[in-house]
């Protein structure tokens, strides 16, 4: 029993001694220097120099040679540098460490102005920075790595977006790739400075502002393809899109603008004069336009259904008159003529006449040609300089009037139009001048309201026929009469 207790006590003593030794090793020994010791160190260095550190350390009781050397180079010597390191010093430090290893005293001799402790601390800092940059570069390489599980799409602006094949369906990937422009599909957009990117998505394109000539005769089909905007969809094959874009200096745009100015000036002239002679002069202007257009070979750009523009001109005159005069005195009472022996019916007003179709196509075509020849013979030699409405330059530039210019000479004439006429293709033309009555719906009246309105307007019997020009609606009064 006594032996066992002795052994246990011996073990406890050994543990206590080991613990005390470890605690002493873990304790940091801080060396302090007093001002008196610093003065002694300076005096000994001035006498012995910086080579005999053992003699200098013997003058102190608790200072070693290493401590004396560090105190001198780190704090007391003014020749050593303090502060940041330059790139040249970092390069020299790395080269010296590669040659001498971790012998910092030798490295400090190479790197002038730095102590061995400063050299060691700087090298440790450089190693930490290098490890940090290598870790960041490794992360960037992993992120930019392309593998089968994580695919990236590179956009033209340099942005890459990962797409996972497992989580997305083929339809989703197709939709996300549909808006990415293909570099081979980037074409020049005419003569403009920007480019046009043709997307692979199926979009409805609007036809350009162009004139469609149906009965124009040309030597080859290239000119018709330039005038007609024909957009074709490509099904995996290379098919060129045929589009027409009018430039600012195009003769067609100039002709359209001159035609608008012509109609406006004619309407103002007729409204200002307010006589039958001014109306006849206006029709002579239109006839002269046709002659000029045929001479200049600009008629091939004309629109076949241009007769609606003549009605629009008369509607414009009527609207100007109704805005300046009183409503009761400005509107002319229509003369209704309905002969049972003929199939022609006309209802004339101050703004124009209603044109009805004739059952026989050959006779009406002959009548139209006779009317045109007589009007050309009568008005071919007359000029417009006396009226001062439009100049010769304007007459030469405008070539967009059809044969419907000589439909009427005054508001009471009626000219039939063939009921059946064959065209190569349907005409789809945006009207150049829309009437304000286009957006007004036709009213519905009862029998008593209809009779009251007829008596108020001075009309004995209602018009049994609606308007014969469905493409362009007549003014408000004719809409009201036709609805009754």
Curated annotation (Swiss-Prot):
GO terms for cellular component: nucleus. Residues 1-20, 215-241, 321-383, 458-484 are annotated as: Disordered. Residues 354-380 have a biased composition (Polar residues). Residues 53-76, 104-127 bind DNA. A motif (Nuclear localization signal) lies at residues 13-20. Expressed at low levels in all organs including roots, leaves, hypocotyls stems, flowers, siliques and buds. Coiled coil: none annotated. Pfam families: Myb_DNA-bind_6 (PF13921). InterPro entries: Homeodomain-like_sf, Myb_dom, MYB_TF, SANT/Myb. Residues 463-476 have a biased composition (Pro residues). One of its GO terms (molecular function) is sequence-specific DNA binding. Residues 232-241 have a biased composition (Basic and acidic residues). The keyword Translocase does not apply. GO terms for biological process: embryo sac development; guard cell differentiation; guard mother cell cytokinesis; guard mother cell differentiation; lateral root development; megasporogenesis; multicellular organismal-level water homeostasis; positive regulation of lateral root development. PANTHER family: MYB PROTEIN-RELATED, TRANSCRIPTION FACTOR MYB88. Transcription factor that binds to DNA in promoters cis-regulatory element 5'-GGCGCGC-3' of cell cycle genes, including cyclins, cyclin-dependent kinases (CDKs), and components of the pre-replication complex. Binds to DNA in promoters cis-regulatory element 5'-AGCCG-3' of auxin regulated genes (e.g. PIN3 and PIN7). Together with FAMA and MYB124, ensures that stomata contain just two guard cells (GCs) by enforcing a single symmetric precursor cell division before stomatal maturity. Interacts with RBR1. This is Transcription factor MYB88. It comes from Arabidopsis thaliana (Mouse-ear cress). The lineage of its organism: Eukaryota, Viridiplantae, Streptophyta, Embryophyta, Tracheophyta.
């Amino acid at each position: 029993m006594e032996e066992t207790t002795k052994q246990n006590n011996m073990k406890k003593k050994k543990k206590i001694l080991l613990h005390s030794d470890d605690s002493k090793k873990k304790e940091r020994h801080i060396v302090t220097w007093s001002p008196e010791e610093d003065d002694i160190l300076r005096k000994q260095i001035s006498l012995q120099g910086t080579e005999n550190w053992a003699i200098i350390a013997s003058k102190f009781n608790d200072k070693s040679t290493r401590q004396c050397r560090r105190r001198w180079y780190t704090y007391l010597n003014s020749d050593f540098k303090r502060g940041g390191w330059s790139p040249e010093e970092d390069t020299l430090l790395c080269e010296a460490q590669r040659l001498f290893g971790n012998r910092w005293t030798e490295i400090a001799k190479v790197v002038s102005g730095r102590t061995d402790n400063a050299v060691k601390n700087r090298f440790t800092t450089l190693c930490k920075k290098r490890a940090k940059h290598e870790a960041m570069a490794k992360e960037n390489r992993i992120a930019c790595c392309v593998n089968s599980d994580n695919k990236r799409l590179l956009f033209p602006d340099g942005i890459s977006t990962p797409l996972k094949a497992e989580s997305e369906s083929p339809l989703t990937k197709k939709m996300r790739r549909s808006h990415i422009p293909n570099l081979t599909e980037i074409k020049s957009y005419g003569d403009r400075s920007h480019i046009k990117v043709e997307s692979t998505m199926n979009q409805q394109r609007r036809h350009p502002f162009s004139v469609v000539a149906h009965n124009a005769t040309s030597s080859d089909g290239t000119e018709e393809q330039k005038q007609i905007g024909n957009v074709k969809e490509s099904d995996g094959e290379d098919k060129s899109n045929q589009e027409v874009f009018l430039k600012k200096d195009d003769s067609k745009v100039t002709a359209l603008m001159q035609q608008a100015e012509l109609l406006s000036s004619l309407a103002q002239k007729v409204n200002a004069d307010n006589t039958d002679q001014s109306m006849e002069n206006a029709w002579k202007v239109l006839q002269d336009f046709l002659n000029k257009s045929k001479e200049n070979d600009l008629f091939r750009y004309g629109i076949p259904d241009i007769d609606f523009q003549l009605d629009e001109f008369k509607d414009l005159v009527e609207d100007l008159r109704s805005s300046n005069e009183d409503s009761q005195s400005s509107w002319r009472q229509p003369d209704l003529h309905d002969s049972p022996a003929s199939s022609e019916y006309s209802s004339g007003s101050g703004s124009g006449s209603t044109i009805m179709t004739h059952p026989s196509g050959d006779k009406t075509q002959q009548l139209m040609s006779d009317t045109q020849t007589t009007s050309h013979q009568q008005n071919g030699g007359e000029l417009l300089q006396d009226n001062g409405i439009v100049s010769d330059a304007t007459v030469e530039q405008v070539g967009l009037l059809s044969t419907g210019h000589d439909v009427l000479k005054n508001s009471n004439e009626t000219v039939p139009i063939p009921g059946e006429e064959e065209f190569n293709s349907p005409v789809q033309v945006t009207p150049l001048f829309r009437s304000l009555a286009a957006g007004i719906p036709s009213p519905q009246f009862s029998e008593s309201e209809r009779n009251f309105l007829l008596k108020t307007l001075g009309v004995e019997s209602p018009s049994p026929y609606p308007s014969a020009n469905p493409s362009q609606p007549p003014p408000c009064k004719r809409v009201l009469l036709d609805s009754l």
